[in-house]
Amino acid sequence: GVIGTYYASEAGFEKNIADVCKDHYAPLGPSDEVPNSPISIVVALADKIDTLTSFWAINEKPTGSKDPFALRRSALGLIRIIIENDIRISLSDILALGNDGADIEDLKYFIHQRMKVFLRDQSLRHDLIDACLSLDKGDDLALLVKKSFALMDFIETSDGSNLIQGFKRANNILLQAEQNDGVEYSYGADPKYAEEEAERNLFYALDNEEVKIRSALEKENFVEAMNSMANLRTPIDIFFETVQINSDVDITRRNR
């Protein structure tokens, strides 16, 4: 690649074209710099996508410690190029472009596992990555990383702790009720069945914070969105402390 760059320069090619000869191999290791010029990025990604999809198409995958075709390195290179250049692109779409009969979902899973290893070295917890992966199937790697780091920073704050405790309290009651009633409470509650002031206040808080949460998510301000969710802890606590969940009236109990 380096020699190719020299030859291309001597042949009169522009520098950004000549540099592609060496840049499309990058990064060769976890500490190597990634390509950052548009042409080099495109060719480097295409090279790695072609390598991965081609080997997946013939069912040649890394097993254990064996990786004779350096596919883990190709996957890590693809991940780093996307993340470090903040490229907003669908992983499924770009893998489909190079698909020669490869199992795209299996290849995505492999790439996600490599990304977990890469991010673990940056002190990001696996369970946080898994939580973010569950939301949108991890198609946008750059966005996934932003969400994961925002979540990690948030849960270490008092607001984060409040949010988790509020969720646990509500979720435990729901799980127990679903088990006892044999139904799934996935539908929303209806304000018209709210009898107590704490119930009505909780509905108001939910509606109020939902507007803020949606706005924050549209701006990809995930910390702001989670702060708004954490604001629900107080009305949730008051609801649990002052309202009898297990009402004698069945429709009221189910709504609560």
Language-model segment annotations:
Residues G1-R256:
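Amphipathic alpha-helical "coupling" segments that flank catalytic cores
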